[in-house]
Amino acid sequence: MTELYCERKTLADLIAFASVEGLPVGEAAKRLCMSRQGAYKAVKALREAGYLSEGPVIKLTQKGRDALSIVLRNLLRYFDIASIKLVGRVVTGLGEGAFYMSLEGYRRAIERELGFTPYPGTLNIKLEPQSLAHRRYLDGLPGIHIPGFTNGMRTYGAVKAFRARLADVEGAVVMPERTHHPVDVIEFIAPVRVRDVLGLKDGDRVELEVYL
């Protein structure tokens, strides 16, 4: 019983400190309305458990992020939540989205599976740290399968997609099985050029609603 209580308290502390990631412990204590002594004690326990890394600021380890993803998955299942929100800022991509979305193999599959013809390009969004647990949660879901294909010269990998909405634009988040993007960058496709329709520029903060 004591072990179960300790585990629950550790997870509760992890959730709290994840919300102030990047801050020094003293500043985090103020934000969380905790005493400095209590905050340092909790951080010490989380570091010993492997959930936080050593250093001058609060920083989750991969183990800590994985634990949050499990908590999130269980909460979403319990509350029967049908969508999640991803928040980030518009960034310039690598230029690959236009090429891949113009390929007939992907275009036809997206028309078939998602019901729209994609604009030849993707909107790249660099996620805020608070959205990374949601992003990793998507990794564990099947999503909508966009099959890979070959054109006789090259093989193109499969893509996992989730229907999504950005402001008034309906589209999809796409997660290629092969990508050069870091985990904190997500790609959004739509039947229109989203930057033009919504008047977006690099650095603009956006919110994506992703349907599960």
UniProtKB/Swiss-Prot annotation:
Class of this enzyme: transferase
Region described as Riboflavin kinase: 84-212
Binding site for Mg(2+): 122, 124
UniProt binding sites for FMN: 179, 187
InterPro entries registered for this protein in UniProt: RibK_CTP-dep, Riboflavin_kinase_archaeal, Riboflavin_kinase_CTP-dep, Riboflavin_kinase_dom_sf, WH_DNA-bd_sf
Annotated stretches, region: Unknown: 1-83
Segments passing through the bilayer: none
Pathway stated in the Swiss-Prot or TrEMBL entry: Cofactor biosynthesis; FMN biosynthesis; FMN from riboflavin (CTP route): step 1/1
Catalytic activity annotation: riboflavin + CTP = CDP + FMN + H(+)
Chain segments annotated as coiled-coil in the UniProt record: none
Keywords assigned: Flavoprotein, FMN, Kinase, Magnesium, Metal-binding, Nucleotide-binding, Transferase
Disulfide-bonded cysteines: none
GO MF annotation terms: magnesium ion binding; nucleotide binding; riboflavin kinase activity
GO process terms (BP): FMN biosynthetic process; riboflavin biosynthetic process
Cofactor(s) the protein requires to work: Mg(2+)
Record EC number: 2.7.1.161
Cofactor: binding details: Binds 1 Mg(2+) ion per subunit.
Amino-acid positions noted as binding CDP in the UniProt annotation, renumbered to this chain: 93-98, 192-195
Family: Belongs to the archaeal riboflavin kinase family.
Function recorded in the entry: Catalyzes the CTP-dependent phosphorylation of riboflavin (vitamin B2) to form flavin mononucleotide (FMN).
Name assigned to this protein: Riboflavin kinase
Species annotation: Pyrobaculum calidifontis (strain DSM 21063 / JCM 11548 / VA1)
